[in-house]
């Protein structure tokens, strides 16, 4: 394809067909656009950070191996304690896309129900990943984490602020304010608050059940010295290797994603039906189940203004 497009193959970036998209950040697929955006000197530091964790993962003893320890923690939480979800909570707005990315890396890799040999797993594997930057999450779903379901949490903090603000008269600067929450939340989860403590604080009797925190809720904290390209590379590699460790322990293939295929295949059938209905006026076939047939019929009835054979039409902006 490169040659047909008129580009010398020697000027093309190689990419192995066995590398899944979720693991391609450090390949040419990720490095090229990142280099165009930030410059290769920055991306090189990112790669060096990822490589440092690769080396650590391959050489450090298990008891000091960060991805191994984190992977084993996840296996313990999921398969032994029965906690199906994990919250990824970075206390930095610059990491707002970390949780959605790790969500794909983790759930697409380890969302499997059979072993690598094709046998049904006799235990639960994989975890539901979600998250938001710290204070955003505190005012949306932390309520559930503290007093609802038990959800193991990954807290990620940064020592040095990217945007420090110092205001005269303030008790602490903006970053210390943020990090106060970072340090406090794991303690709140771990130790909670008992009815006896609340009574000592003269809390109304009828409010005590509502203000009680059970504690004993698992979390881990990662504290980065700074948030630069090198540390981001390290952080990404830690999570990638962690996911692989979980897959190794569960005996599953963390590098395929057959679960994506069925939906795509069924979507192709729907696409053919939509084309036939719009161009030829054909009714929805009996091959669809009753629910889908009903929804498709309603959808087509409500979109009769869609042209059957349009010229190129773009939205007006």
UniProtKB/Swiss-Prot annotation:
Stretch forming the signal peptide: none
Originating species: Clarkia lewisii
A family per Pfam: PGI
Highest taxon of the lineage: Eukaryota
Record EC number: 5.3.1.9
Annotated CDD domains: SIS_PGI_2
Family membership noted in the UniProt record: Belongs to the GPI family.
Catalytic activity field: alpha-D-glucose 6-phosphate = beta-D-fructose 6-phosphate
TM segment ranges: none
GO CC, alphabetical: cytosol
Active site: 108 (proton donor), 139, 264
Main location: cytoplasm
Record Gene3D superfamilies: 1.10.1390.10, Glucose-6-phosphate isomerase like protein, domain 1
UniProt name for this protein: Glucose-6-phosphate isomerase, cytosolic 2B
Subunit description: Homodimer.
Record-level GO BP terms: gluconeogenesis; glucose 6-phosphate metabolic process; glycolytic process
Keywords of the record: Cytoplasm, Gluconeogenesis, Glycolysis, Isomerase
Top-level taxonomy: Eukaryota, Viridiplantae, Streptophyta, Embryophyta, Tracheophyta
Record's subcellular location: Cytoplasm
């Amino acid at each position: 394809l490169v040659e047909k497009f008129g580009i010398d193959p020697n000027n093309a970036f190689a990419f192995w067909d066995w590398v899944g998209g979720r693991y391609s950040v450090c390949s040419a697929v990720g490095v090229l656009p990142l280099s165009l955006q930030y410059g290769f000197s920055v991306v090189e530091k990112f790669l060096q950070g990822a490589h440092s964790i690769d080396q650590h993962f391959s050489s450090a003893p298990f008891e000091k191996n960060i991805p191994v320890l984190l992977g084993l923690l996840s296996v313990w939480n999921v398969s032994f304690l029965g906690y199906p979800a994990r919250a990824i909570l970075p206390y930095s707005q610059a990491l707002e896309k970390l949780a959605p990315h790790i969500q794909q890396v983790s759930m697409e890799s380890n969302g499997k129900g059979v072993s690598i040999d094709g046998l049904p797993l006799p235990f639960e594997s994989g975890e539901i990943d979600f998250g938001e930057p710290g204070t955003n999450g505190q005012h949306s779903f932390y309520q559930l984490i503290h007093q609802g379901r038990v959800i193991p949490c990954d807290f990620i903090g940064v020592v040095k602020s990217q945007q420090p603000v110092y205001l005269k008269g303030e008790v602490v600067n903006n970053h210390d304010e943020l990090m106060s929450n970072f340090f406090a939340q794991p303690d709140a989860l771990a130790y909670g608050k008992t009815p006896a403590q609340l009574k000592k604080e003269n809390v109304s009797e009828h409010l005590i059940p509502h203000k009680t925190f059970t504690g004993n809720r698992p979390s881990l904290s990662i504290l980065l010295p700074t948030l630069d390209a090198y540390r981001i590379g390290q952080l990404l590699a830690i999570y990638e290797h962690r996911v692989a460790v979980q897959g190794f322990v569960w005996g599953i293939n963390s590098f395929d994603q057959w679960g994506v295929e069925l939906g795509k295949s069924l979507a192709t059938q729907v696409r053919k039906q939509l084309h036939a209905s719009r161009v030829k006026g054909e009714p929805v076939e009996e091959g669809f189940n009753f629910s889908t047939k009903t929804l498709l019929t309603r959808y087509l009835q409500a979109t009769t203004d869609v042209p059957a054979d349009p010229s190129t039409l773009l939205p007006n902006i």
